[in-house]
Amino acid sequence: MTSAKTASAPDSFFTASLDQADPEIAAAIKGELGRQRHEVELIASENIVSRAVLEAQGSVMTNKYAEGYPGARYYGGCEWVDVAENLAIDRAKKLFGAGFANVQPNSGSQMNQAVFLALLQPGDTFMGLDLAAGGHLTHGSPVNMSGKWFKAAHYTVRREDQIIDMDAVQKQAEEIKPKLIVAGGSAYSRAWDFKRFREIADSVGAYLLVDMAHFAGLVAGGVHASPVPYAHVTTTTTHKSLRGPRGGLILSNDETLAKKLNSAIFPGLQGGPLMHVIAAKAVAFGEALRPDFKVYAKNVVENAKALAEAMKSHGFDIVSGGTDNHLMLVDLRPKGLKGNVSEKALVRAAITCNKNGIPFDPEKPFVTSGLRLGTPAATTRGFGVAEFQQVGGMIAEVLNAIAQSDDGKAPLVEAAIKERVKALTDRFPIYQ
């Protein structure tokens, strides 16, 4: 018979550090910390959270199951997680001027799935921005649930300027009569005309969903128009430019949709919410309500414009000619380069970004003709216009070197840039 002593947790269970309990994972985390400290992070969907967010997400809230919503749980002992979730809800509503907020989505994909579950039936028609023009997988890609379970029709950008043609969107909506129109994307650098999108949706009897996952932090900071007054439903991730933990958020000012949206998340898609993540969301929303976040959002946009201009000054083409938000797409075709090769070269030089398709891209998704660059993470660590101008120059040096790879100088250039990146990042330390 097993004794109580041997059946219980080991003596070190509540006291051992991660180094002691699992040195392999501890080493991986230390390696990732070193990477983040000494690389320039330009992936537009990534950011650097505060120590307070890290602490909340690594808290004892992870132990608690809390199916349901505050005040209506299926488990006892939820009094403190109710406090955390109510704070997250109230702060999200205040931050975005919304009457309703659901803070439980585990991810951006699940928040959008929930809206589809609440508003559509399988086989219904909806419209979204084409992935190749800067949209997102969950906006109707044929490899995604949204494109498999529903009839997706895509609007796109004009070939001549790579900007959405709203008259074409109107005409397409009138022709196909979608039940839902999605505005938002993952690689579109220009402002969205939410008022016009709502007018188009109303004219054909459609719901308007705005997925502001990429630019929500700019909305919160007052440097980007808010979709909340126009959309029937607004969704966003809580990381990216909002600088919180990875997760999702659903907002609405339409009281008639609140119950449907709540039911779509639970019990429709999810069971017990991740209460440690919700606590961290509350912390991040609180941070975004402070005056300094407005300064941050302003700097993100200024830095993006500076980086775009720096790239142009070094002879690179920027899709649509520039940016109105936190990201840009670099068209590599004039340099004879591919996105996958360019991404790897920059990673070797300690500059992290991602290959990305550009509008009407002739290359396959794992090759691409473009790079996506974003400024939220490096802005968080303190980079300003001067630093992003330097970064633009370093990117150009690396890419020009691999474009002339036959001279054998590319590895030397990459190594030299890596040293310059370390000197730059050492001036802006994180998590000391």
UniProtKB/Swiss-Prot annotation:
Its main location: cytoplasm. Its EC number is 2.1.2.1. It is found in: Cytoplasm. The record marks H239 as: Plays an important role in substrate specificity. (6S)-5,6,7,8-tetrahydrofolate binds at L131, G135, H136, L137. InterPro entries: PyrdxlP-dep_Trfase, PyrdxlP-dep_Trfase_major, PyrdxlP-dep_Trfase_small, Ser_HO-MeTrfase, Ser_HO-MeTrfase-like, Ser_HO-MeTrfase_PLP_BS, SHMT-like_dom. It catalyses: (6R)-5,10-methylene-5,6,7,8-tetrahydrofolate + glycine + H2O = (6S)-5,6,7,8-tetrahydrofolate + L-serine. Keywords: Amino-acid biosynthesis, Cytoplasm, One-carbon metabolism, Pyridoxal phosphate, Transferase. GO terms for molecular function: glycine hydroxymethyltransferase activity; pyridoxal phosphate binding. The keyword Cytoplasm applies. GO terms for cellular component: cytoplasm; cytosol. It comes from the Bacteria. Pathway: One-carbon metabolism; tetrahydrofolate interconversion; Amino-acid biosynthesis; glycine biosynthesis; glycine from L-serine: step 1/1. The keyword Amino-acid biosynthesis applies. Its cofactor is pyridoxal 5'-phosphate. It holds the Pfam family SHMT. CDD domains: SHMT. The modification N6-(pyridoxal phosphate)lysine is found at K240. GO terms for biological process: glycine biosynthetic process from serine; tetrahydrofolate interconversion; tetrahydrofolate metabolic process. PANTHER family: SERINE HYDROXYMETHYLTRANSFERASE, SERINE HYDROXYMETHYLTRANSFERASE 1. Homodimer. Belongs to the SHMT family. Catalyzes the reversible interconversion of serine and glycine with tetrahydrofolate (THF) serving as the one-carbon carrier. This reaction serves as the major source of one-carbon groups required for the biosynthesis of purines, thymidylate, methionine, and other important biomolecules. Also exhibits THF-independent aldolase activity toward beta-hydroxyamino acids, producing glycine and aldehydes, via a retro-aldol mechanism. This is Serine hydroxymethyltransferase. The lineage of its organism: Bacteria, Pseudomonadati, Pseudomonadota, Alphaproteobacteria, Hyphomicrobiales.
